[in-house]
Regions:
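Beta-sandwich/jelly-roll carbohydrate-recognition scaffolds of carbohydrate-active enzymes
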Residues: 1-180, 213
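Long, well-ordered core segments of solenoidal/helical folds
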Residues: 154, 200-221
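Alpha-helical support elements that line or immediately flank enzyme active sites
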Residues: 145-158, 181-205
Length: 222
């Protein structure tokens, strides 16, 4: 983690972002997290504190302080009564906090955990149903497990309004295709993408358009 920021907006909403540098250099991930019960107490600590914190040093930022920044932040939340289940909803965005909040409303909204789980199961059933096969339980388990693995990546990389952060770190708007990322084309061009051309051509088209956008935004033209 190169830097992270967390804001406790109110007793049921937390927002923030994290900048990392690894396989994806200077990668921005924003989040919005809501709780079904109000937070009573919370605290934070930076496991990699800065040598000098400026004016922040005069505050006790480890207990009930609504904003913290650092490279090694850990937090805890106390909800008091644990007699009822706690539901936590989280949405991500590479664009910004507003995007994460909009994604949270659009994709989680008023749904319960059970409703979200049922929707996820239904969508996976639709994906797995593109191929009908017969055989032993072991063979079918291997086939559909492998098919499941093909659906994990490439993954959608944009907000619900079509905005996404390009490889040029600018915010782009797409209207005619779904933007994808995590291609690993050197491994997947032999079998995965030909499979997509057979079982999910719409997704294959979106992936190609995403690659073309990547090419146009890249200073290296790759």
């Amino acid at each position: 983690t190169r830097w992270a920021q967390v804001r406790v907006e109110n007793d049921t909403l937390v927002t923030g972002y994290r900048i990392t540098s690894g396989w994806a250099r200077t990668n921005y991930t924003y989040f919005a997290m809501s709780f079904s019960k109000p937070v009573r107490e919370y605290g934070a600590r930076d496991r990699r504190p800065l040598d000098y914190g400026g004016g922040w040093r005069k505050f006790d930022t480890e207990r009930n302080f609504p904003e913290i920044g650092g490279c090694g932040i850990v937090m805890h939340f106390d909800f008091g009564d644990d007699s009822a289940p706690l539901e936590v909803k989280v949405a991500l965005s590479a664009v910004g906090t507003r995007g994460a909040l909009a994604n949270l409303c659009a994709e989680a909204g008023g749904r319960t955990f059970d409703q979200a789980a049922a929707d996820a199961a239904r969508k996976w059933e639709e994906q797995m149903s593109v191929i009908e096969a017969q055989g032993s339980d072991e063979a079918l388990r291997m086939l559909y497990t492998s098919l499941y693995h093909t659906m994990i990546n490439p993954s959608v990389y944009m907000d619900t309004d079509g905005k996404y952060r390009g490889v040029d770190h600018e915010i782009h708007q797409t209207r005619d295709f779904t933007n994808y990322t995590v291609f690993s084309v050197w491994d997947t061009y032999r079998a995965l993408h030909p499979l997509f051309n057979l079982i999910c051509r719409d997704r294959s088209r979106d992936i190609v358009n995403s690659m073309l956008a990547h090419y146009r935004q890249s200073v290296h033209r790759i």
